[in-house]
Amino acid sequence: MNPNARPHIEKILANMTQLPGVYRMLGKDGELLYVGKAKNLKNRVSSYFVKTIEHPKTQALVARIHDIETLVTRSETEALLLEQNLIKQHRPPYNIMLRDDKSYVYIFVSSDKPYPRIASGRGKGKHQIGKFFGPYPSAYSARDTLLVLQKLFNVRQCENSYFAQRKRPCLQYQIKRCSAPCVGLISPEDYKQDVDNSIRFLQGDTKELNQELIAKMEEAAEQLAFEKAMFYRDRLGLLREVQAQQAVFKIKGEADILAIAFQAGVTCVQIMYVRNGRMLGGKSYFPDMLSDDLGQMLSDFIANFYFQVADEVPSELIVNVELPDRKELEQALQTQFDKKIQIKHKVRETRAEWQELAIMNVQHAIKGQLSNHLELNERFHQLEQVVGRPVDRIECFDISHTMGEATIASCVVFDQGGARKRDYRQFGIEDITAGDDYAAMRQALTRRYKKHIVPDLLLIDGGKGQLHMAMEVMQTLGLDAFMVGVSKGEGRKPGLETLHFTDGSKIQLPEDHKALHLIQQVRDEAHRFAITKHRAKRDKRRAGSVLEVIPGLGPKRRRDLLTHFGGIQGVLKASEKELMLVSGLGPSMARTIYKILHE
């Protein structure tokens, strides 16, 4: 406990109620550090200040607490709902469990008539009308399923704007992954059948599809339509190949199976997804927890995950440990998602198979993570020896632009648990001389540390010049930051980097030094993060700049044009009559656009 705050905290604890409710822990400047819920506020909050607390994250939290506020509720369920609402609203740093909190990936079948599209994306976009299937454990697994659907049923996956402006079939048709509805090479009736079959496939109804394909293949063979028979034979082979890879269980229904494991300071939660009796796969999470009790940790994870990250919750959650507040958690989830939800620990038969599979996967995942964890810890340890001070959090900046165009600065964050992707930041750099990397870095550092705490190590991708500029920024902000500049070697060859320190000294580590490997890993991630955003910004700006010279064509109409034709290339290829089809463009403006673009 912070010595300066001890008298105040002890007074608060002495007068605290034993009713259920929510507690908020505040820092020196009143900033919200952590939100928690309790069945008994006095007992729960007091437990943070006992001498036996050993968890590093809890110790770090307690050291920063200067004040505690409480809100009494009528029940523990009400407290849980309020806790999750406050976390969602304020995002306190010590409530952050997941380093990467991307939402679920779904496959989406649109309701566009007469030619729906199939695509994948994160979350159930409320602006989209259609059917969603999933969740899928990763974008890769969703794309893999889409590829199978393309090969089986040839349903389009292109954007509506691209679809609308096609005049001839695209490459997808040439490689037999689309039936080219854009140019009328398939009737709406036949296309609808392909869409319906795609939906049946996504719902797991592959047995009937199998029988239908056999019947069509035999019918085509009897009619001596051998090319058609071969087409159905190939589809049948692909479908059977997919069926062989899928785990399909006898019972239908939906469930998430969650297994937790804790070993050597690493917590892992494995989630397996079952929908319509099909195992869709699973994903491993490595949350930062404040507890060492497996049941409490899994309960906290479930509350955080389904309230803060997931778009849906299935009717069953199967867990591998008993949860201390199972009933309250069920009630809170039912209130949030407006459906009956059961959390089960002791299960039999098929559900026991699911549970066993999740346990096997969590044990495998934690072994792999421990191996990575040990390697990363060793890299951090060797880096600490090189710089002569403790290092837990590293932040690294990089600048990306093309001849001064669309300049982007990136900031990536690593700690001894790995990359903290939810702490990454990107800065669009404006109002500087084109190509001035020093000014770009100055602006990014100022914007980052005007309100944020400096890390244990600030890595600057650049040599002495960039480092001196960073020192000036920190001096202006009145901050004491430990910084190291990283300059590339001859020919920009990896392994020849030089580290520059603020006292003017510099060192070159051996190519196989683990500290150098860590620095390269962080720097390369900063470069990747910057250049990805830069390219997107540059391409968007270039697409718009061609249209900006057209008088009377404002931002909204430019955006409508690009959306309608699927990009600047589509606009350039469009005729006057096609331009007139864009909403809000009359004959005069269409003529002007065409004339200027084709002069």
UniProtKB/Swiss-Prot annotation:
Main location per the UniProt record: cytoplasm
SMART domains xref list: GIYc
Function (record text): The UvrABC repair system catalyzes the recognition and processing of DNA lesions. UvrC both incises the 5' and 3' sides of the lesion. The N-terminal half is responsible for the 3' incision and the C-terminal half is responsible for the 5' incision.
Assembly: Interacts with UvrB in an incision complex.
Record protein name field: UvrABC system protein C
UniProt record similarity statement: Belongs to the UvrC family.
Domain named UVR: residues: 207-242
GO biological process: nucleotide-excision repair; SOS response
Organism of derivation: Acinetobacter baylyi (strain ATCC 33305 / BD413 / ADP1)
Cellular localisation: Cytoplasm
Keywords: Cytoplasm, DNA damage, DNA excision, DNA repair, Excision nuclease, SOS response
Residues in GIY-YIG domain copies: 18-96
InterPro entries referenced in this protein's UniProt entry, alphabetically: GIY-YIG_endonuc, GIY-YIG_endonuc_sf, GIY-YIG_UvrC_Cho, RuvA_2-like, UVR_dom, UVR_dom_sf, UvrABC_protein_C, UvrC
Domain of life: Bacteria
